[in-house]
């Protein structure tokens, strides 16, 4: 299949709402079934030698996975909910973040590259939260150079000036970072059947957040359900007065 044919097919698919199919045309082929998406995925050649972004207790039996598009407003409002739950349950659960940039969001992929670039300096989570907090500054910037400078400014502030801004800019175009983004999206689309963002999965079970009246409660209830099954204490950790 030549590039022109692929471009035509992609255009038709987008017109029909087939956004999720883009992944299979845009990435190198690999066996998605070789990966257990309910666990933390290690670095290998398919993901550009970039492991899953994980925070929480090592070896946690309950893993919450989020597939997110940084340009998605729902993902921006989801992050504080997950951060709160992580603080309350972090000694018993783990949290994995995977990128799933939607085709209709023109700056989503570059934002994913920004957090991966920050990750190379150890500032993934700080930059992720900063990009969400300042999304109004970059979501509509179409000029590549201007957008890069906005990302760099957000990165610098998120790291309190400790990050190397020039390295950050250079790494935005790292081929391994692009490979990691494609890898995450392919796993989401082909293995976990992600069709929208944010998508939340707990131990492989996809939560129906679209129809939930209280998303935070839905996630917390599911966490407690799995904690109970695992014989662990349910509810938030007790805090000292």
What residue ranges belong to the model's regions?
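Ser/Thr/Pro/Gly-rich low-complexity linker/stalk segments immediately outside membranes or between
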Residues: 25-41
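Structural alpha/beta surface segment adjacent to cysteine/selenocysteine redox centers
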Residues: 60, 65-70, 76-159, 192-195, ...
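Residue-level detector of conserved, well-ordered beta-strand and adjacent loop positions
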Residues: 56, 65, 208
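A generic local structural motif
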Residues: 49-53, 81-82, 185-187
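C-terminal cap of thioredoxin/glutaredoxin-like
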Residues: 1-30, 153-241
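A short beta-strand-turn-helix
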Residues: 45-62, 87
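Short clusters of hydrophobic/aromatic residues that line enzyme substrate/ligand-binding pockets
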Residues: 54-55, 138, 172
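Short secondary-structure boundary/capping elements
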Residues: 45-47, 77, 180
């Amino acid at each position: 299949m030549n590039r022109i044919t692929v471009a035509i097919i992609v255009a038709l698919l987008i017109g029909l709402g087939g956004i999720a199919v883009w992944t299979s045309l845009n990435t190198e082929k690999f066996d998605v079934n070789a990966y257990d998406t309910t666990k933390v995925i290690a670095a290998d050649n398919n993901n550009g030698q970039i492991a899953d972004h994980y925070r929480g207790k090592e070896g946690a039996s309950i893993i919450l996975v989020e597939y997110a598009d940084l340009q998605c407003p729902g993902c921006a409002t989801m992050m504080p909910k997950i951060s709160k739950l992580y603080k309350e349950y972090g000694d018993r659960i783990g949290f994995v973040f995977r990128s799933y940039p939607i085709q209709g969001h023109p700056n989503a992929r570059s934002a994913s590259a920004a957090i991966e670039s920050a990750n190379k300096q150890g500032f993934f989570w700080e930059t992720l939260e900063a990009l969400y907090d300042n999304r109004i500054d970059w979501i509509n910037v179409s000029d590549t150079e201007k957008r890069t400078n906005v990302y760099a400014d957000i990165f610098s502030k998120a790291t309190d000036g400790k990050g190397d801004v020039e390295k950050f800019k250079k790494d935005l175009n790292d081929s391994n970072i692009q490979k990691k983004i494609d890898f995450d999206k392919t796993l989401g689309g082909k293995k976990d059947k992600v069709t929208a963002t944010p998508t939340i999965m707990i131990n492989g079970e996809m939560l129906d957040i679209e129809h939930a009246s209280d998303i935070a409660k839905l996630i917390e209830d599911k966490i407690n359900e799995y904690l109970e099954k695992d014989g662990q204490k349910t509810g938030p950790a007790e805090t000292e007065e």
